[in-house]
Amino acid sequence: LNGQYRRPTGIVGRIIAGRMAQQHQPENAWTVSLLHVQPSDHILEIGFGPGTTIQRLAMLTSEGHVTGIDYSSTMVSLASRRNARAIKAGRVKLCRGNVVNLPFANHTFDKVLSIHTLYFWQEPLRALAEIQRVLKPGGTLALTILPREKWPGGGTGTEYCIVYSGDDVVKLMLDAGFTSAHVEPCPLPTQFRELSVIGIK
């Protein structure tokens, strides 16, 4: 089952996607708010899952564009149906791919976000360097995670995922070339124990 969270597939993957869409809606909305999205922004979401945050971003970028990349072809299919109208209008583009090899030109995006995916990145430093590459100068990355100290089982992770503290992620971002990075604790009720690390190119 843990492997399904890394790359949801088939019927089980679709069930997990439905659970994710409902369970993570509050922190997804909070993460979007941290980006201070402007109507003309070009935004990338990495690991968009069922596509609910893509849908939210599309509503906020009436003069811009939203791109999503996900490791799971099941999620690409599901999110494409959810966002079919915006895709047809040319305002959203979704594709399957890997964060360590983003198929975008340098300086493409104003903002990038990724929510609950860092744990599954096999090469986090390389991935963050790729994100830094595709961000415009001064662009913002919001990376939302459940930090190690809040992780079930004492923060040891599993064979499928690696867990991090906020400070770990700050260091990774700076090592990847971001000019600054800081931790934003989640202000939502206590059942939401996430934080977001904000990096500026």
Predicted segment positions?
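Conserved class I S-adenosyl-L-methionine
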Residues: 140-170
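Core SAM-dependent methyltransferase catalytic element
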Residues: 176-179, 185-201
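Short glycine-dipeptide loop
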Residues: 40, 135-140
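A short acidic, Gly/Pro-enriched loop at the edge of an enzyme's catalytic core
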Residues: 100-111
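A short glycine-rich, Lys/Arg-flanked "PGG" loop and its adjoining helix->strand segment in the class I
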Residues: 125-137
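Class I SAM-dependent methyltransferase SAM/SAH-binding core
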Residues: 42-101
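A short SAM/SAH-binding and catalytic strip from SAM-dependent methyltransferases
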Residues: 111-124
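Conserved alpha-helix/loop element of class I SAM-dependent methyltransferases that forms part
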Residues: 22-41
